[in-house]
A protein has these predicted regions:
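Conserved Lys-Pro-Asp/Glu-containing loop-to-beta segment of HAD-superfamily phosphomonoesterases
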Residues: 17, 119-144
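Secondary-structure boundary/capping motif
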Residues: 71-73, 119, 162-163
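Short, charged, surface-exposed secondary-structure boundary motifs
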Residues: 112-117, 167-169
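Acidic, Mg2+-coordinating phosphoryl-transfer loop and its flanking beta/alpha structural elements
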Residues: 134-169
Length: 169
């Protein structure tokens, strides 16, 4: 198993931005594994049943992946923030696809907190702690509730990944 994404040429940026990317529906197309309930919510049991190596490796990259690569090469600090419970298979896929990152923040095992509350809580320190407070931040996600939650933290730019990707599909 490959344990780290192959490195590419990367600019040493003295004033990097913090670029935060969701995975599913943002950088990765995992829609073939999704089933929704009648009310539109995610069928989590179906999702977990389809988190096998065979199913995960059928996922594909979305156009926003290239923005992530560009941000990484420009020396920005790349954070992957996902509501997935990350597994070894997920990491293997991320590394095999060349998805560059400096930090991954994911759902703790067994945590059932709604996505936008979880992500806001997990990312809050980038807005509150002194070393990060005055650094420019960008947040990319396809979920409107997540965008609103992160936007409520204050200064930063949020991008609707669904709209972004649809421009290029």
């Amino acid at each position: 198993m490959k344990l780290k994404t192959n490195f590419c040429e990367r600019f040493y940026n003295l004033s990097p931005r913090i670029c935060i990317y969701d995975l599913d529906g943002t950088v990765i197309d995992s829609s073939h594994r999704i089933k929704l309930h009648d009310n539109g919510s995610l069928d989590l049991d179906h999702w977990k049943q389809n988190c096998t190596r065979d199913q995960i490796f059928k996922d594909d990259l979305l156009p926003l992946y290239w923005q992530l690569v560009s941000d990484y090469k420009q020396g920005n600090y790349i954070v992957i923030c996902t509501a997935r419970e990350m597994t070894e298979i997920d990491l293997e896929f991320i590394h095999s696809m060349g998805i560059y990152y400096d930090k991954i923040i994911s759902r703790p095992k067994g945590n059932t907190t709604v996505d936008h509350v979880l992500k806001k809580s997990q990312l809050r320190y980038f807005w509150n702690l002194k070393p990060f407070k005055n650094i420019s931040k960008s947040f990319y996600d396809d979920n409107e509730n997540n965008l609103k939650a992160i936007n409520s933290l204050g200064i930063g730019t949020v991008f609707n990944a669904g709209e972004w990707n649809n421009r290029y599909l």
